[in-house]
Amino acid sequence: MTRSGFVAIAGRPNVGKSTLANALVGAKVAIISDKPQTTRRAIRGIATGEDWQLVLVDLPGVQRPRDVLTTRMQRRVERELDDADGCLLVVNAEQGIGPGDRFIARLLGGASVPVVIAVNKIDRVTRGRLAEVLTDAAKLDVGDDVFPVSARTGDGVRALVDHFVSLLPEGPFYFPPEQHSDQPEEILLAELVREQVLARTTFSSSSSTSTLIACGSSSRVAASAFSRTSSAICASTGRSLRCSGGK
Protein backbone atom coordinates (compact mmCIF):
# COMPACT_ATOMS: atom_id res chain seq x y z
CA MET A 1 0.00 0.00 0.00
CA THR A 2 1.28 3.44 -0.90
CA ARG A 3 1.22 6.53 1.31
CA SER A 4 0.71 10.09 0.11
CA GLY A 5 -0.20 13.49 1.46
CA PHE A 6 0.38 17.23 1.54
CA VAL A 7 2.84 18.91 3.90
CA ALA A 8 2.78 22.71 4.26
CA ILE A 9 6.15 24.38 4.91
CA ALA A 10 5.68 27.45 7.10
CA GLY A 11 8.09 29.94 8.63
CA ARG A 12 8.93 33.60 8.76
CA PRO A 13 10.69 35.16 5.77
CA ASN A 14 14.26 34.11 4.99
CA VAL A 15 14.61 31.08 7.26
CA GLY A 16 15.45 28.86 4.29
CA LYS A 17 12.05 27.33 3.49
CA SER A 18 12.58 27.32 -0.26
CA THR A 19 16.10 25.90 0.00
CA LEU A 20 14.79 23.18 2.29
CA ALA A 21 11.89 22.43 -0.07
CA ASN A 22 14.37 22.00 -2.92
CA ALA A 23 16.50 19.69 -0.76
CA LEU A 24 13.51 17.57 0.25
CA VAL A 25 12.35 17.21 -3.36
CA GLY A 26 15.84 16.73 -4.76
CA ALA A 27 15.20 19.26 -7.53
CA LYS A 28 14.85 23.04 -7.86
CA VAL A 29 11.17 23.84 -7.49
CA ALA A 30 11.39 27.14 -5.61
CA ILE A 31 13.63 30.14 -6.24
CA ILE A 32 16.02 31.39 -3.58
CA SER A 33 16.90 34.94 -2.56
CA ASP A 34 17.96 36.75 0.60
CA LYS A 35 15.26 39.38 -0.02
CA PRO A 36 11.91 39.25 1.85
CA GLN A 37 8.78 37.90 0.14
CA THR A 38 10.72 35.98 -2.51
CA THR A 39 8.07 33.24 -2.40
CA ARG A 40 4.81 34.99 -3.29
CA ARG A 41 2.67 32.01 -4.28
CA ALA A 42 2.27 28.60 -2.69
CA ILE A 43 4.65 26.36 -4.66
CA ARG A 44 4.15 22.61 -4.68
CA GLY A 45 7.20 20.39 -4.86
CA ILE A 46 6.76 16.64 -5.19
CA ALA A 47 9.05 14.12 -3.50
CA THR A 48 8.37 10.49 -4.44
CA GLY A 49 9.81 7.25 -3.08
CA GLU A 50 9.10 3.63 -3.90
CA ASP A 51 5.84 3.53 -1.94
CA TRP A 52 5.27 7.11 -0.80
CA GLN A 53 4.73 10.61 -2.15
CA LEU A 54 5.12 13.89 -0.27
CA VAL A 55 3.58 16.96 -1.85
CA LEU A 56 5.41 19.86 -0.22
CA VAL A 57 3.68 23.23 -0.28
CA ASP A 58 6.29 25.99 0.09
CA LEU A 59 4.23 28.80 1.59
CA PRO A 60 5.06 32.52 1.43
CA GLY A 61 6.87 33.73 4.54
CA VAL A 62 4.38 34.15 7.39
CA GLN A 63 4.41 37.55 9.06
CA ARG A 64 2.02 40.02 10.59
CA PRO A 65 0.09 41.55 7.66
CA ARG A 66 1.33 45.11 6.98
CA ASP A 67 -0.12 45.86 3.55
CA VAL A 68 -2.48 44.49 0.91
CA LEU A 69 0.14 42.12 -0.54
CA THR A 70 1.12 40.53 2.77
CA THR A 71 -2.54 40.29 3.79
CA ARG A 72 -3.39 38.37 0.59
CA MET A 73 -0.36 36.14 1.03
CA GLN A 74 -1.36 35.47 4.64
CA ARG A 75 -4.86 34.38 3.61
CA ARG A 76 -3.35 31.99 1.06
CA VAL A 77 -1.16 30.50 3.78
CA GLU A 78 -4.16 29.88 6.01
CA ARG A 79 -6.08 28.16 3.18
CA GLU A 80 -3.17 25.88 2.35
CA LEU A 81 -2.76 24.88 5.99
CA ASP A 82 -6.42 23.90 6.15
CA ASP A 83 -5.89 21.42 3.29
CA ALA A 84 -2.60 19.92 4.50
CA ASP A 85 -1.97 16.53 6.11
CA GLY A 86 0.98 17.89 8.08
CA CYS A 87 2.98 21.05 8.65
CA LEU A 88 6.70 21.75 8.80
CA LEU A 89 7.66 24.88 10.75
CA VAL A 90 11.13 26.06 9.70
CA VAL A 91 13.24 28.24 12.01
CA ASN A 92 16.74 29.67 11.56
CA ALA A 93 19.54 28.31 13.77
CA GLU A 94 21.70 31.38 13.06
CA GLN A 95 19.08 33.89 14.16
CA GLY A 96 17.55 31.79 16.91
CA ILE A 97 13.92 31.82 18.00
CA GLY A 98 12.35 35.27 17.83
CA PRO A 99 8.95 37.00 18.01
CA GLY A 100 8.14 36.04 14.40
CA ASP A 101 8.63 32.35 15.15
CA ARG A 102 6.46 32.60 18.25
CA PHE A 103 3.76 34.39 16.26
CA ILE A 104 3.66 31.54 13.71
CA ALA A 105 3.73 28.92 16.46
CA ARG A 106 0.62 30.50 17.95
CA LEU A 107 -1.09 30.37 14.54
CA LEU A 108 -0.25 26.68 14.27
CA GLY A 109 -1.19 25.92 17.86
CA GLY A 110 -4.73 24.99 16.91
CA ALA A 111 -3.78 22.96 13.84
CA SER A 112 -5.53 19.62 13.49
CA VAL A 113 -2.54 18.06 11.69
CA PRO A 114 0.90 17.01 12.99
CA VAL A 115 3.38 19.90 13.22
CA VAL A 116 7.12 19.25 13.03
CA ILE A 117 9.83 21.87 13.63
CA ALA A 118 12.97 21.97 11.49
CA VAL A 119 15.87 24.01 12.83
CA ASN A 120 17.61 24.94 9.58
CA LYS A 121 21.14 26.22 8.82
CA ILE A 122 22.82 24.09 11.49
CA ASP A 123 26.01 24.15 9.42
CA ARG A 124 26.44 27.82 10.34
CA VAL A 125 26.39 27.53 14.14
CA THR A 126 28.46 25.86 16.84
CA ARG A 127 27.24 22.78 18.66
CA GLY A 128 26.68 24.81 21.80
CA ARG A 129 24.59 27.38 19.95
CA LEU A 130 22.62 24.63 18.21
CA ALA A 131 21.77 23.02 21.55
CA GLU A 132 20.39 26.36 22.77
CA VAL A 133 18.24 26.87 19.67
CA LEU A 134 16.91 23.30 19.77
CA THR A 135 15.87 23.86 23.40
CA ASP A 136 14.17 27.15 22.51
CA ALA A 137 12.43 25.53 19.52
CA ALA A 138 10.99 22.83 21.77
CA LYS A 139 9.61 25.57 24.03
CA LEU A 140 7.47 26.88 21.16
CA ASP A 141 5.03 24.21 22.31
CA VAL A 142 3.80 23.36 18.83
CA GLY A 143 4.39 19.82 17.65
CA ASP A 144 6.26 17.03 19.39
CA ASP A 145 9.31 16.67 17.14
CA VAL A 146 12.24 18.97 16.43
CA PHE A 147 14.76 18.11 13.69
CA PRO A 148 18.14 19.83 13.18
CA VAL A 149 18.80 20.15 9.44
CA SER A 150 20.95 21.91 6.89
CA ALA A 151 19.20 22.43 3.58
CA ARG A 152 22.53 23.54 2.09
CA THR A 153 24.58 20.45 3.03
CA GLY A 154 21.73 17.94 3.29
CA ASP A 155 22.44 17.03 6.92
CA GLY A 156 19.28 15.75 8.62
CA VAL A 157 17.13 15.99 5.48
CA ARG A 158 16.72 12.22 5.04
CA ALA A 159 15.62 11.77 8.66
CA LEU A 160 13.06 14.54 8.21
CA VAL A 161 11.64 12.92 5.06
CA ASP A 162 11.43 9.51 6.75
CA HIS A 163 9.55 11.03 9.68
CA PHE A 164 6.95 12.71 7.50
CA VAL A 165 6.50 9.54 5.44
CA SER A 166 5.64 7.70 8.66
CA LEU A 167 2.89 10.27 9.30
CA LEU A 168 1.29 10.06 5.85
CA PRO A 169 -2.13 8.47 5.40
CA GLU A 170 -2.48 5.53 3.04
CA GLY A 171 -3.52 6.54 -0.45
CA PRO A 172 -2.55 6.65 -4.13
CA PHE A 173 0.02 9.02 -5.62
CA TYR A 174 -1.34 12.44 -6.61
CA PHE A 175 1.26 12.98 -9.35
CA PRO A 176 3.40 10.81 -11.66
CA PRO A 177 6.59 9.65 -9.87
CA GLU A 178 8.86 11.55 -12.28
CA GLN A 179 7.11 14.90 -11.70
CA HIS A 180 8.79 17.35 -9.28
CA SER A 181 6.39 20.31 -9.38
CA ASP A 182 2.82 21.16 -10.32
CA GLN A 183 3.84 24.57 -11.69
CA PRO A 184 3.36 25.12 -15.46
CA GLU A 185 6.56 25.53 -17.47
CA GLU A 186 5.96 29.24 -18.06
CA ILE A 187 5.60 29.86 -14.31
CA LEU A 188 8.79 27.93 -13.53
CA LEU A 189 10.69 29.90 -16.17
CA ALA A 190 9.28 33.20 -14.93
CA GLU A 191 10.37 32.41 -11.38
CA LEU A 192 13.89 31.49 -12.52
CA VAL A 193 14.16 34.81 -14.35
CA ARG A 194 12.87 36.65 -11.27
CA GLU A 195 15.51 34.87 -9.17
CA GLN A 196 18.23 36.28 -11.43
CA VAL A 197 16.67 39.75 -11.33
CA LEU A 198 16.74 39.66 -7.52
CA ALA A 199 20.32 38.39 -7.47
CA ARG A 200 21.61 41.14 -9.77
CA THR A 201 19.70 44.18 -8.56
CA THR A 202 19.44 46.30 -5.43
CA PHE A 203 15.82 45.64 -4.54
CA SER A 204 15.19 45.72 -0.81
CA SER A 205 12.08 43.58 -1.31
CA SER A 206 11.16 41.06 -3.95
CA SER A 207 7.62 42.46 -4.08
CA SER A 208 8.92 45.12 -6.55
CA THR A 209 9.71 42.53 -9.20
CA SER A 210 7.59 40.62 -11.66
CA THR A 211 8.31 38.49 -14.69
CA LEU A 212 6.30 37.31 -17.65
CA ILE A 213 7.08 34.34 -19.84
CA ALA A 214 5.24 33.90 -23.12
CA CYS A 215 5.77 30.36 -24.38
CA GLY A 216 5.25 29.52 -28.01
CA SER A 217 7.14 28.86 -31.20
CA SER A 218 9.43 31.75 -30.28
CA SER A 219 9.67 32.26 -26.53
CA ARG A 220 9.88 35.80 -25.21
CA VAL A 221 11.02 36.94 -21.81
CA ALA A 222 9.96 40.19 -20.21
CA ALA A 223 10.77 41.58 -16.80
CA SER A 224 9.70 44.71 -15.03
CA ALA A 225 12.45 45.94 -12.75
CA PHE A 226 12.73 49.24 -10.90
CA SER A 227 16.32 49.23 -9.76
CA ARG A 228 19.83 49.59 -11.04
CA THR A 229 22.08 46.69 -11.96
CA SER A 230 25.64 46.55 -13.22
CA SER A 231 25.31 43.11 -14.81
CA ALA A 232 23.18 41.67 -17.58
CA ILE A 233 20.33 39.33 -16.77
CA CYS A 234 20.06 36.51 -19.28
CA ALA A 235 17.24 34.20 -20.19
CA SER A 236 17.83 30.60 -21.18
CA THR A 237 17.81 31.71 -24.82
CA GLY A 238 20.95 33.75 -24.14
CA ARG A 239 19.29 37.10 -24.78
CA SER A 240 19.93 39.80 -22.20
CA LEU A 241 17.09 41.61 -20.51
CA ARG A 242 17.29 45.39 -20.61
CA CYS A 243 16.97 47.02 -17.20
CA SER A 244 14.84 50.13 -16.99
CA GLY A 245 14.12 52.41 -14.11
CA GLY A 246 15.58 55.14 -12.01
CA LYS A 247 19.24 56.08 -12.07
Predicted regions mapped to residue ranges:
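C-terminal effector/interaction modules appended to NTPase cores
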Residues: 1-6, 13, 206, 220, ...
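Solvent-exposed alpha-helical segments within well-ordered globular domains of core cellular machineries
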Residues: 8, 22, 41, 45, ...
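Conserved Switch II/interswitch segment of TRAFAC-class P-loop GTPases
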Residues: 81-103, 112-130, 152
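Long, well-ordered amphipathic alpha-helical subdomains in the mid-to-C-terminal portions
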Residues: 178-206, 220
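Low-acidity, Ser/Thr- and Arg-rich intrinsically disordered low-complexity segments
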Residues: 202-244
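Conserved, well-folded catalytic cores of nucleic-acid-processing
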Residues: 27, 46-50, 62-65, 80, ...
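Conserved G1/Walker A P-loop phosphate-binding module
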Residues: 1-87, 91
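Canonical P-loop GTPase G-domain recognition
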Residues: 113-116, 123-181
